[in-house]
């Protein structure tokens, strides 16, 4: 949820689309019936706090029936 920049009431996201892999354009509409402003915001990745390390796949635990999943 975003607040309307004109009246400060809640504005709900109506739709969005990716501009790049790390930037999203989002359309909002103010929920205040006396305002009803529609505006666009941009959401983008600025930096990572933690990045995952290398992932090593392991075999899944056996199911209760004793069988294993055969996807590896």
Swiss-Prot record:
Keyword presence, Transcription: yes
Role, per record: This protein may act as an activator of P2 late transcription through an interaction with the alpha-subunit of the host RNA polymerase.
NCBIfam families per UniProt: PRK09678.1
Pfam families with a match to the protein in the record: Ogr_Delta
InterPro entries registered for this protein in UniProt: Znf_Ogr/Delta (IPR007684)
Top-level division of the source organism's lineage: Viruses
Keywords: Activator, Late protein, Transcription, Transcription regulation
Record-given protein name: Late control protein ogr
The keyword Transcription is annotated on this UniProt entry: yes
């Amino acid at each position: 949820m975003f607040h309307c920049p004109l009246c400060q009431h809640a504005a709900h996201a109506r739709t969005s689309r990716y501009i790049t892999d790390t930037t999203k354009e989002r359309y909002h509409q103010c929920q205040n019936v006396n305002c009803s402003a529609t505006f666009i915001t941009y959401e983008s990745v600025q930096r990572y706090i933690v990045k995952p390390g290398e992932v090593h796949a392991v075999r899944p635990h056996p199911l209760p029936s004793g069988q294993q999943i055969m996807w590896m």
